[in-house]
């Protein structure tokens, strides 16, 4: 029988202002986990902490943090651990600026690596020891299809997401026998604010409109449409559950853009 219950588990989700992160927080909570998440502004915190979970046992707590800054990330980790150890970590925070390689400075590269990659490294390094100690843990890296199929317009983004996949596989090999399962999720075209922004930029450059761009891009997916944040959250929830006890080191794409 499929067991998706997360009752009694404590989870952390980074970058949950909206989109995939928000959906993951809600779904983990609905399945019984108590979730701590971070966002950059108070409105996002309030919006999500007011969510009425389907589970009477779960709690949702939001903390303001800028995960592109080491000190802010460390403060988030410290405050989270003050309430006890973590069983589940979902490294979701990230940005995907579209820019020309020839005009990207060293600072541009460093800033995106701090946010997309080093935030995940810092959180994993801090929360993983307890998982090893108790012989049970889940670490999910929200990577991207760009980590496997790089885009000319998202060079630095793709590089950070490729690195997340590599780190995930290495950690899976290192800690799998300790009961800590580490996997990557590679969302493709998911209808989020990020893709709406990208569609708008394409539309402006081509003289079209964003809705037409989204529809056309959706046809490149075998299913014929963009995915939803909730569909990504469903996969994450499964990977965090006991029913995913033999999935380790996987890099799961959804949905395929390239076949």
Q: Which residue stretches match the model-derived regions?
A:
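Conserved small/polar residues in nucleotide/adenosyl-binding loops
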Residues: 257-259
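Alpha-helical segment proximal to the catalytic Tyr-Lys
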Residues: 129, 173-174, 245
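Conserved glycine-rich cofactor-binding loop
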Residues: 10, 17-18
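Substrate-binding pocket helix/loop in short-chain dehydrogenase/reductase
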Residues: 100-101, 108-113, 217
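Residue(s) in the substrate-gating loop at a strand-loop-helix junction
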Residues: 144
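Active-site helix of classical SDR
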Residues: 124, 160, 168
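Short, small/polar-rich loop/turn modules that mediate ligand/substrate recognition or access, typified
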Residues: 176, 181, 247-249
């Amino acid at each position: 029988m499929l067991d998706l219950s997360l009752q009694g588990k404590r989870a952390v989700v980074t970058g949950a202002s909206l989109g995939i992160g928000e959906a993951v927080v809600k779904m983990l909570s609905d399945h019984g986990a108590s979730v701590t998440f971070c966002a950059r502004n108070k409105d996002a915190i309030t919006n999500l902490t007011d969510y009425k979970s389907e589970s009477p046992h779960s709690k949702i707590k939001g903390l303001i943090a800028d995960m592109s800054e080491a000190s802010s990330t460390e403060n988030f980790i410290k405050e989270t651990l003050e309430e006890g150890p973590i069983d589940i970590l979902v490294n979701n925070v990230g940005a995907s600026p579209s820019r020309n390689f020839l005009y990207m400075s060293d600072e541009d590269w460093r800033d995106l690596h701090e946010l997309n990659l080093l935030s995940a490294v810092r959180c994993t390094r801090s929360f993983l020891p307890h998982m090893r100690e108790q012989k049970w843990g889940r670490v999910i890296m929200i990577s991207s299809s760009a980590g496997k199929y790089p885009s000319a317009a998202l060079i630095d983004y793709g590089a950070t997401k490729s690195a997340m996949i590599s780190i995930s596989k290495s950690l899976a090999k290192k800690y799998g026998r300790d009961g800590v399962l580490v996997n990557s999720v590679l969302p493709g075209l998911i209808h989020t604010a990020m893709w709406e922004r990208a569609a708008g930029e394409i539309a402006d450059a081509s003289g079209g409109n964003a809705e037409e761009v989204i529809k056309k891009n959706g046809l490149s997916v075998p299913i014929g449409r963009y995915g939803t944040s909730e569909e990504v959250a469903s996969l994450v929830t499964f990977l965090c559950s006991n029913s995913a006890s033999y999935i380790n080191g996987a890099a799961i794409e959804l949905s395929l853009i390239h076949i």
